């Protein structure tokens, strides 16, 4: 981990391109969009996360003497360029979708408007930060949805792909819905609840399980969750836990947050049997927590089996997004400003794969909500100077399958612009909510989705459409590029 200054958190080619621009001077102001193409885990949406760390990265973006010396030692960069880097700082604008927001493929999550050297340099770090945290926040949202209101504890630090992945992955997991994390440093840095019980080693270090439970319970009577699977859940663990709870009750010690945790075995069967035993002893309000390689699919299955579990510790498969370990965000040039007219000239990247053809121009994104339900009807990508009037009827259509059209009657919908300014002329203009506030925002955001878009198997797609004006720009650019290709072939 390198605190604050992450300027060299970049791919080498960003710096070699910067030197190329420097040696061939240009005053070009450009627009780059960060977006992704496919929802993680085959889901119906993603959660935007990582923006605060992007802002902090921009605020601390400067080359130190040590950075310059290292770059000089690569024998790639010339002295006049290295001297330029000494005074480098970001002067552009950044717009972004706020953290905790539900997002969909192809819409810009982050838009950078800056001199081309600056916009090029920040590509790698923006992708690194946003891809990671958006992935984990999305996975957490899925896991929490499967739990149907039960608390999900993020327990993945020891299995995370290094310290930063553990710290910031836990941050993202809380944004996505987790009630807290086992990572104490994340708790300190972001003021989120830290949670935990004890390990099997605690039990094994005592002469017997009962003594281990009793000692722990006396030390932590207000947070007494006992791990019952060290030896035998039903023959030893649960009976010894009940014995300790009964002794505390007889002594007048108020049991607040108490219960058991099961970390192995048939969680459905064991939880149901443990619940019967606890209830018979008068402890039917005890927490029954489960861990053991959980994810949204296993939790959903356990819920369907009526497992008596009401608290879940999820580690490896959350902090690594085990079944979908990469978010897939990309960063593409979308427009170049004409210095004479001040207008942005749209740029497009073509591909034989139509899904990889970029959307050109300086753009913004509008979310369209149904007035009657509050649910999302569609997202609309527009050119930045376009405004939507919710009193007017509009027709939106799929940018790939253009025959798929939907008419939205005026007066039946509300509109929200998703991209907000976070950096203007190199300075922060945005105050991020706290992580716990972002968690609440994320939960509210997910309530605007239909359940059909949240299911894990074949979710209903939320359409991200292009405005007619933007679609026409894209169509004309594709036709223009096609003509140039034909002219080249004829030559």
Go through the PLM ranges and name each one.
Residues 26, 30-86:
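N-terminal, Lys/Arg-enriched amphipathic/low-complexity engagement segments
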Residues 94-100, 413-418:
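Short acidic, Pro/Gly- and aromatic-enriched capping/linker segments at domain boundaries
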Residues 56-60, 96-99, 103:
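An N-terminal, globular interaction/scaffold subdomain
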Residues 1-29, 38-40, 76, 82-91, ...:
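Buried, small/hydrophobic-residue-enriched core segments of structured protein domains
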Residues 58, 122, 126-130, 442, ...:
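Short amphipathic C-terminal alpha-helix that caps PH/PH-like domains
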Residues 74-82, 162, 394-402:
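Short, positively charged
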Residues 1-28, 32, 37, 41-43, ...:
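Gly/Ser/Thr/Ala-enriched C-terminal appendages of enzymes
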């Amino acid at each position: 981990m390198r605190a604050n200054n992450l300027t060299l958190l970049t791919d080498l080619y960003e710096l070699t391109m910067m030197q190329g621009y420097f040696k061939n001077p240009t005053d070009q102001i450009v627009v780059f969009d960060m977006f992704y193409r496919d929802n993680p885990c085959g889901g119906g949406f993603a959660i935007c996360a990582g923006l605060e760390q992007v802002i902090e990265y921009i605020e601390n973006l400067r080359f130190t003497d040590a950075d310059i010396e290292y770059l000089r030692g690569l024998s790639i960069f010339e002295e006049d360029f290295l001297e330029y880097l000494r005074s480098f700082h970001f002067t552009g604008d950044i717009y972004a979708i706020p953290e905790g927001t539900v997002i969909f493929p192809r819409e810009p999550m982050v838009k950078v408007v800056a001199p081309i050297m600056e916009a090029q340099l920040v590509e790698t770090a923006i992708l690194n930060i946003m891809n990671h945290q958006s992935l984990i926040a999305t996975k957490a949202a899925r896991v929490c949805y499967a739990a149907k209101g039960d608390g999900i504890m993020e327990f993945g630090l020891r299995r995370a792909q290094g310290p930063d992945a553990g710290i910031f992955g836990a941050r993202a997991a809380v944004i996505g819905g987790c009630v807290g994390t086992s990572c104490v440093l994340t708790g300190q840095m972001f003021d989120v609840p830290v949670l935990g019980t004890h390990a099997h080693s605690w039990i094994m270090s005592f002469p017997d399980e009962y003594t281990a439970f009793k000692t722990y319970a006396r030390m932590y009577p207000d947070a007494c969750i006992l791990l019952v699977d060290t030896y035998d859940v039903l023959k030893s663990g649960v009976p010894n836990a009940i014995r300790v709870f009964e002794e505390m009750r007889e002594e007048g010690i108020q049991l607040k947050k108490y219960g058991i945790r099961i970390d192995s075995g048939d969680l459905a069967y064991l939880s149901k049997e443990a619940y019967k035993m606890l209830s018979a002893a008068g402890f039917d309000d005890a927490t029954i927590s489960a861990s053991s390689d959980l994810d949204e699919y296993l939790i959903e299955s356990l819920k369907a089996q009526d497992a008596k579990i009401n608290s879940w510790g999820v580690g490896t498969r959350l902090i690594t997004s085990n079944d979908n370990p990469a978010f897939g965000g990309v960063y593409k040039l979308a427009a170049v400003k004409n210095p004479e007219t001040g207008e942005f000239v749209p740029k497009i990247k073509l591909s034989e794969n139509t899904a990889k053809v970029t959307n050109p121009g300086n753009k913004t994104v509008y979310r369209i909500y149904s007035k009657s339900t509050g649910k999302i009807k569609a997202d609309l990508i527009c050119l930045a100077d376009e405004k939507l009037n919710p009193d007017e009827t509009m027709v939106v259509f799929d940018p790939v399958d253009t025959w798929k059209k939907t008419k939205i009657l005026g007066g039946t919908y509300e509109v929200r612009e998703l991209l907000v300014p976070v950096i203007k002329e190199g300075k922060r203009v945005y105050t991020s909510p706290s992580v716990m506030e972002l968690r609440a925002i994320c939960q509210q955001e997910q309530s605007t989705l239909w359940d059909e878009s949240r299911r894990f198997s074949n979710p209903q797609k939320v359409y991200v459409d292009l405005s007619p004006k933007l679609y026409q720009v894209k169509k004309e650019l594709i036709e223009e590029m096609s003509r140039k290709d034909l002219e080249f072939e004829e030559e």
